[in-house]
Amino acid sequence: MDKLIKTISASGAFRAYVLDCTETVRYAQERHHTLSSSTVALGRTLIANQILAANQKGDSKVTVKVIGDSSFGHIISVADTKGHVKGYIQNPGVDIKKTATGEVLVGPFMGQGHFVTITDYGTGNPYTSTTPLITGEIGEDLAYYLTESEQTPSAVGLNVLLDQEDKVKVAGGFMLQVLPGASDEEISHYEKRIQEMPAISTLLASENHIDALLAAIYGEEPYKRLAEEQLSFQCDCSKERFASALMNLPTADLQAMRDEDQGAEIVCQFCGIKYQFTEADLEVLINDKA
């Protein structure tokens, strides 16, 4: 089971989240049939979204939109405070050649664009924030958003590693944030530690990457584990929800689906599940609209 661990330094000057999202990203790859580069781009977005949702309280939901002018198209993800996330990439078929070390590049091919977050607190007034894509690597873009939009200096590292068959091998990352009251000396100390950290891909390749991430962040410094939360890819779509959407169509359109198409098929963008509406199903909807 995927998980997110929340920690805080003994001094209370910093907090860090570390995540294992391997099964989440693996399931997303299976559902959307993504090729290598699309898998990594979507996976990083899902991880970033889970970090943002973990920062919220109550029954909030956070939507992340990575909108660039690249061949990836838009990447959309939605996560809640219960550890659930869903998402899709507009073009699942991007397969850019790897580097000599086997890395899948994303940033250089993301293009110009924006990192958009929409936080829904359930009050009917969602809060939207938009920051520019800085590198297109998603992790750096999330760090920039947290620092500039939420005014919380942050460091973020996240990645998805693939095996020789381009299947998800491991996925995860970390977020480190400065908390109010941190001294300049403490900030400088952790800035130096982050600069000296091994590459996120190296840490994820460790036998136990959760422990490797925590060791890289804290070293010998004492810290406290605050919480451990389970994470998963979970879509809340249903035939009933799509039936409600069909009810918003003009009756003539529903009649055409019934008489000309002998039914309708709706595919959920977020998880790829297909829902079939037979002629009888459409007849019920038409009668309900009457």
UniProtKB/Swiss-Prot annotation:
Name used for this protein in its record: 33 kDa chaperonin
Localisation per UniProt entry: Cytoplasm
Role, per record: Redox regulated molecular chaperone. Protects both thermally unfolding and oxidatively damaged proteins from irreversible aggregation. Plays an important role in the bacterial defense system toward oxidative stress.
Gene3D superfamilies: Hsp33 domain, HSP33 redox switch-like
Entry's family note: Belongs to the HSP33 family.
Gene: hslO
Signal peptide: none
GO biological process entries: protein refolding
Keywords: Chaperone, Cytoplasm, Disulfide bond, Redox-active center, Stress response, Zinc
Entries under PANTHER family matching the protein: 33 KDA CHAPERONIN
GO cellular component annotations of the record: cytoplasm
Protein modification: Under oxidizing conditions two disulfide bonds are formed involving the reactive cysteines. Under reducing conditions zinc is bound to the reactive cysteines and the protein is inactive.
GO molecular function, one term: protein folding chaperone
Matches recorded under NCBIfam families: PRK00114.1
